[in-house]
């Protein structure tokens, strides 16, 4: 067994993301038998000593049958109506299933905005930490009833990766209707399972298919989430929900994604992956070398242009001369102030304007 699989198998804190297809039937509504089997596997892992946070899809799918709908709606209003009905059913089903073991569950509904805004980010973190301390099972889902962008393709996979870093998890397990990553379309019979992904180069030529009939997150979404988590220092296991027992027992199934050696700090992870980008700073080649290679602060002299309207404390993207993003960071000045000082050396500026535009501690190269 690889070192990554051993790390996942022995992880003291795990986030388990469960896709819609693993929880709902083809005609809509929850499949209680599947859900109970997943709860059994999670309970076994918790009894073995691990803390587990569950990121559960399925609200929209669970709301279809009660509303007389036979397929996933395309319009936002109907999706949100289905989510409002299904969320109740989903929370009740998880609560009933874990009650067999005397476990209490807590529902945590999040939107991307809750992760992107620093204050809400910290509040969500404290809530999840407290639920774990009280030995309750946190059932996390997107707040689909009020969200807009969050109902787009694959967002719950990304949410799971963000939650994994939010709670300081030692591993992320993605469970769905696929049993791992293949080098081609497994439905065509000539594809080979990729047991471990060590770097982005391992994904060259890999075909990312679409999601299932009831889900929104296809393989491309899962790969993106796995890369995000692994880049943040969290190893990932992608496996079939039907193999949940083995996945959570010894990580001996599916595809494992090797994490980077060091974990990003909570603040730098937030800057790089969670915060909304409010504007753009265009920088010259010298500034690119200073920021990316030498990991130094961004000074006004290296900025050639400003795009967007933003304020001190906002997160912006830094683009090099080829217009490609090279870093993200927290700016010290408003966009109007930067426009007045860009291209100037520090010595040309008044004392109160001699701080770096983006300090090295607030910069994250991409």
Curated annotation (Swiss-Prot):
Q: Where is it located?
A: Cytoplasm
Enzyme Commission code: 2.7.2.11
A Pfam family this chain is assigned to:
PUA
SUPFAM superfamilies, alphabetically?
Carbamate kinase-like, PUA domain-like
- Which residues of the sequence carry a binding annotation for substrate? 57, 144, 156
Pathway in which the depicted protein is active = Amino-acid biosynthesis; L-proline biosynthesis; L-glutamate 5-semialdehyde from L-glutamate: step 1/2
Q: Domain PUA, which positions?
A: 278-352
* One function term, GO molecular function aspect: RNA binding
Q: May I have one GO cellular component term?
A: cytosol
Q: Which InterPro entries match?
A: AceGlu_kinase-like_sf, Asp/Glu/Uridylate_kinase, Glu/AcGlu_kinase, Glu_5kinase, Glu_5kinase/COase_Synthase, Glutamate_5-kinase_CS, PUA, PUA-like_sf
Among the record's GO biological process terms, what is one?
A: L-proline biosynthetic process
Q: Does the keyword Iron apply?
A: no
Entry keywords, A to Z: Amino-acid biosynthesis, ATP-binding, Cytoplasm, Kinase, Nucleotide-binding, Proline biosynthesis, Transferase
**Record carries keyword RNA-binding:** no
Name the job this protein performs: Catalyzes the transfer of a phosphate group to glutamate to form L-glutamate 5-phosphate.
Family stated for the protein in its record: Belongs to the glutamate 5-kinase family.
| The protein's name in its UniProt record | Glutamate 5-kinase
Provide the taxonomic classification: Bacteria, Bacillati, Actinomycetota, Actinomycetes, Mycobacteriales
